[in-house]
Amino acid sequence: MGTLSVNQNKLQKRLRRLAGEAVADFNMIEEGDKVMVCLSGGKDSYTMLDVLMHLQKVAPIKFDIVAVNMDQKQPGFPEHVLPAYLKELGIEYHIVEKDTYSVVKELIPEGKTTCSLCSRLRRGTLYTFADEIGATKMALGHHRDDIVETFFLNMFFNGSLKAMPPKLRADDGRNVVIRPLAYCHEKDIQAYSDLKQFPIIPCNLCGSQENLQRQVVKDMLIDWERKTPGRTESIFRALQNVQPSQLADRNLFDFSNLRIDETAASRFVNVVNI
């Protein structure tokens, strides 16, 4: 890639700045961390690796990066692409081979979406591998739009108010997941991926499935954004401004013991009598 144009330079700086802010805001990376960057071969994970490698050069702390891809034995998966790319970058990398493709095809009926089971199997394998190599953080490439979409998916289909946190301790307690692109827009990531000409590997297992719930939600948000620009950004800000007393979750707020403040009542009476 040659010299960047003014707009391309702004795009690169914006992605680096937003990722840096997310890392700082949530204390994602600390001195001496070994960050396992999970690469799928898609635009998001390539961009994440690119941004983290820059951050590694300019950050005031020292941390290591190791790239990891999971070969799930999908038919037609180009096994040479990622090793060639990562060798050229000159960073440590591992290819974890596990045939989850056959498991998914066996358990999921034809025509049904495979994403949920596929991601669970992949996540479990990567958690185990992170522990094996001594990784202290596991970086995933989810961006701001993914987080907002997940919020609506959980609300519409699971009856819960939750999304994807920028930083998460896994249920096993052994892994901390970070999402450095949490503040980044998907459209910027797509533009940067096109600019850098990353060697994208399509997902043959689920990439062509129609009517996925996530795609329905994505289309809804795109339509909202078209009609009311800035709405998606406002929704993301709302996830950072939760007020438990204004919801109805008794586990988050103690409604049972909510009483009038007698001292406040007496102060009001005194003010009225003055």
UniProtKB/Swiss-Prot annotation:
Pathway: tRNA modification. The keyword Iron applies. GO terms for biological process: tRNA thio-modification. A motif (PP-loop motif) lies at residues 40-45. Its EC number is 2.8.1.-. It is an enzyme of class 2 (transferase). Binds 1 [4Fe-4S] cluster per subunit. The cluster is chelated by three Cys residues, the fourth Fe has a free coordination site that may bind a sulfur atom transferred from the persulfide of IscS. Coiled coil: none annotated. Its cofactor is Mg(2+); [4Fe-4S] cluster. GO terms for cellular component: cytoplasm. [4Fe-4S] cluster binds at residues 115, 118, 206. It catalyses: cytidine(32) in tRNA + S-sulfanyl-L-cysteinyl-[cysteine desulfurase] + AH2 + ATP = 2-thiocytidine(32) in tRNA + L-cysteinyl-[cysteine desulfurase] + A + AMP + diphosphate + H(+). Pfam families: ATP_bind_3. GO terms for molecular function: 4 iron, 4 sulfur cluster binding; ATP binding; magnesium ion binding; sulfurtransferase activity; tRNA binding. Its main location: cytoplasm. The thiolation reaction likely consists of two steps: a first activation step by ATP to form an adenylated intermediate of the target base of tRNA, and a second nucleophilic substitution step of the sulfur (S) atom supplied by the hydrosulfide attached to the Fe-S cluster. Homodimer. Belongs to the TtcA family. This is tRNA-cytidine(32) 2-sulfurtransferase. It comes from Pseudomonas savastanoi pv. phaseolicola (strain 1448A / Race 6).
